[in-house]
Amino acid sequence: MKQPRLLPALLLALLMLLPAGCGTQTTGTPQQTSTPTETVTASGAAGTLRVQVPDGWKYEVCPEGTLDDSEACFGVKIWPDSGSDSCVQLYWSDSFGVCGMGLKEETLTLAGDSVSTGYYDGDKNWTFLSYQGKNSGTVAWTDPNAPWFAAQGEQMLAVLDTVEWEPAA
């Protein structure tokens, strides 16, 4: 009598275990996007910043003195969702600093280098990325509550994985 009940229970257990072994594994490095892209370049006295922006995303090149950080800052504002007011400001700064109150930092690898990733007040989404190594001085800043984060946060990290900084000669 117990045998007819055992088979459905085994099948149910097997079905519950299958999804755990499938899918993509998160390794701390975003997956590359296969969407066609455009190379966006921002230049200033300190050098040149490049990033690959997917087709369909909005961007604005910001010359020196047009961003909030300092007069020397320049970069690109990137909107993954054309209907959103919230963007990522990707820029080079000679004086980036943050307040430590409520800050938790983790390290990612993007564009072949270590990146300090800042989360404030328990947010699950990052507020800033500060590149080290060959891309040192490059910063990405955004609103961690932006509506596009849920659907396009990983794709944004893939875009930020394409950052290239070339210091002036």
Where does each model-flagged region fall?
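Bacterial N-terminal signal peptides that target proteins for export
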Residues: 1-10
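Signature of long, low-cysteine stretches enriched in small and polar/charged residues
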Residues: 95-151, 167-169
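Short, hydrophobic/aromatic-rich segments at coil-to-beta transitions
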Residues: 34-41, 72-75, 109-118
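Bacterial signal peptide processing site
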Residues: 23-25
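C-terminal motif of bacterial Sec signal peptides marking the signal peptidase cleavage site
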Residues: 18-21
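Hydrophobic helical h-region of N-terminal Sec-dependent signal peptides
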Residues: 10-16
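Secretory pathway targeting signatures of secreted, lumenal, and periplasmic proteins
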Residues: 41-98, 120-127
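N-terminal low-complexity, Pro/Thr/Ser-rich intrinsically disordered segments
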Residues: 27-49
